[in-house]
Design a protein with these regions (language model features):
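Sequence-level motif detector for i,i+2 pairs with an aromatic at +2
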Residues: 115, 127-130, 146, 192, ...
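Duplex nucleic acid-engaging cores and interfaces of nucleic-acid transaction enzymes
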Residues: 212-222
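Short alpha-helical scaffolding segments that buttress acidic/His motifs in well-ordered protein cores
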Residues: 147-151, 220, 298-303
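Conserved polymerase palm-domain catalytic core
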Residues: 174-177, 181-196, 200, 224, ...
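Conserved phosphate-binding loops in nucleotide/dinucleotide-binding enzymes
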Residues: 206-207, 211
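Non-catalytic, polymerase-adjacent accessory regions of viral genome-replication enzymes
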Residues: 1-172
Length: 418
């Protein structure tokens, strides 16, 4: 993600972010069963968050910080990985060229972290019951600039009909104006533009396209919040997270079902997940970690902005638009409290046999050794989701007998294949 406070004089221990004790219990963190070395990844992220004294993409908007030469003497720029943010071959102008082309060795965008955000990360990691009380000030003009360059340049415009290149024409003035409005409380979120794309089954999936300024601010807020929630999310959570792509989720799933004692599998699908996220519950979950009232008001604005379809505005009482920059983080926070912590506790306290889980966004697979555990967990999952306004899709959620002798056992019982 993008960064802020590239030239902050505040040390990690002197960050303006403060915190107070909360009372939410936290389940134990699970190490993902993949081929990735978690300790090396953690050291890399620490270095990224600690990187300071540099503007976005290693450049300064003044002459104080010199441009980094192309030959970096073998030193790789430190950055936190991002997923699915490709670059276009064209650029708005030569003055914006370098910032949009700086890349890491793995091809992901170069995004240095500020000391302030490093302090947020350390505070959140040190005590997962702390509520952080001062977060909005981390959304600086520099972070907004970085967030702008994280956006897809060819993305369709929202209700403002403004493209990335339109905004780039008067970039500096507009970023400064946007920054001022955010901190004066004058920023207003625009409704999402409703559009539809076809689904594999022939039905249409609704998408919400945010206005360009809303995308910028959402990207900045996501950067700040990821410093908190990446310390909280459990090891079996994948999807729309730094370094946790679908390929790593599949790797973890393969290891889980081949190396563990798995005889039964719940293959689950949540019906209309993003369209049914409860605003009330989501804000309660966010308040477990965020005590900054201004940041909470900002996060609530995007939930209440509504949607515009064919020029007609309608309110949104539940759900968050698929396609919005902030929605994947909202979804992961929601399922962290509704599913992840619950199933992690359930398998430790109630399961008779071994239980393994891999979740990718709103899709998840749970493996069981015991059939009784699988059937009981599925029944309790339905009740758990109903409490928070969610539902397991009755046609797409399956309980599957699995394993080396599964087919033989089904044949003996006269059962049909799954």
């Amino acid at each position: 993600m993008s960064n802020d406070q590239g030239e902050s004089d505040v040390s990690p221990t002197e960050s303006e972010t403060t915190s107070t004790a909360g009372n939410l219990p936290h389940g134990s963190r699970e190490t993902p069963e993949t081929s990735v070395a978690p300790m090396a990844a953690d050291r890399s992220e620490k270095a990224r968050c600690h990187k300071s004294g540099m503007h976005v993409s290693g450049e300064s908007h003044s002459s104080i910080v010199p441009k980094k030469p192309a030959n970096n003497s073998g030193r790789t720029p430190l950055a936190e990985p991002a997923e699915g943010r490709g670059l276009t071959k064209e650029n708005a102008s030569p003055s914006l060229l370098d910032r949009t082309q700086r890349r890491n060795k793995d091809g992901t965008p170069f995004r240095p972290r500020s000391r302030g955000l490093w302090g947020v990360r350390q505070a959140a990691r040190k005590d997962r019951k702390l509520k952080l009380t001062s977060l909005l000030h981390h959304i600086t003009a520099e972070l907004l600039r970085a967030s702008f360059f994280e956006l897809k340049k060819q993305a369709a415009p929202g209700v403002d009909d403004e493209t990335w290149r339109d905004y780039a024409e008067d970039f500096e003035r507009r970023i400064e104006d946007l920054h001022g409005r955010i901190h004066r409380g004058a920023y207003r979120a625009k409704p999402s533009k409703r559009t539809y794309i076809p689904k594999p089954d022939g039905r249409m999936r609704p998408l919400g396209i945010a206005a360009l300024e809303d995308k910028i601010v959402q990207q900045a807020a996501r950067t700040v919040l990821e410093c908190i929630y990446e310390q909280d999310f459990l090891g079996f959570s994948y999807g729309f997270r730094p370094g946790r792509s679908q390929h790593r989720a599949l790797d973890a799933l393969y290891v889980g079902i081949t190396k563990r004692k798995v005889n039964w599998i719940i293959d689950a699908d949540i019906r209309g997940f993003f369209d049914n996220i409860s605003h009330e519950w989501l804000m309660k979950f966010l308040e477990h970690r965020i005590a900054d009232r201004r940041m909470l008001r900002l996060l609530k604005k995007w939930l209440r902005a509504g949607v515009s379809e064919d020029g007609e505005w309608s309110p949104t009482k539940v759900g968050t638009p698929q396609g919005a920059v902030i929605s994947p983080l909202y979804g992961n926070v929601f399922l962290h409290y509704v599913l992840d912590l619950w199933i992690d506790d359930w398998r430790k306290r109630q399961a008779r046999g071994e239980v393994t889980i891999v979740r990718y966004a709103d899709d998840f697979v749970i493996g069981f050794r015991e059939e009784s555990d699988a059937r009981r967990c599925l029944a309790e999952l339905r009740e758990r989701f109903a409490k928070f306004g969610l539902e397991l899709h009755p046609e797409k959620t399956r309980l599957i007998e699995f394993g080396r002798y599964a087919e033989e056992r089904r044949t003996k019982r006269g059962a049909s294949p799954p």
